[in-house]
């Protein structure tokens, strides 16, 4: 599949750097610099999210993460760029809004829904996911970390 990005995403293909290891002559080592894809949605985050974000028939997204989740941070930025609503279900308490990750997520327009640890454990529970789908029928649910 192509790694072509949507027009709203300022995507730069990751370069491949050759690395020399003087102690091991003849060894060829190459590093794919996915960290350079984008300053916020980089590396494996882009690879995991690009297919979810290209779905045409969704009106919003729901996903899960902790108070310092790189996944939610990247997803919130991408949703903001696409003008797509995001409901971020976050394990923790509202006082965590003091951290830069959640401040960015909030500034990019995501609705942050704080849940306790017991509620957060339900994020893979079939009945819980069905209740979210019933409540938000036009939203796509993305697992924690974008692992779908």
Predicted segments with their positions:
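PLP-dependent amino-acid enzyme catalytic core
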Residues: 1-148
């Amino acid at each position: 599949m192509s790694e072509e990005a949507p027009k709203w995403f300022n995507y730069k293909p990751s370069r491949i750097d050759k690395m020399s290891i003087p102690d091991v002559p003849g060894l060829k080592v190459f590093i794919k610099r996915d960290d350079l894809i984008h300053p916020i949605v980089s590396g494996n985050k882009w690879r995991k999210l690009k297919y979810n974000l290209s779905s045409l028939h969704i009106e919003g997204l729901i996903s899960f993460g902790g108070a310092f989740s790189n996944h939610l941070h990247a997803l919130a930025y991408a949703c903001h760029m696409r003008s797509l609503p995001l409901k971020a279900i976050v394990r923790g308490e509202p006082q965590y809004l003091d951290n830069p990750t959640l401040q960015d997520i909030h500034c990019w327009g995501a609705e942050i829904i704080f849940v306790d640890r017991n509620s957060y454990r339900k994020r893979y529970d079939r009945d819980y996911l069905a209740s979210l789908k019933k409540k938000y029928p036009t939203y796509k649910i993305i697992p924690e970390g974008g692992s779908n």
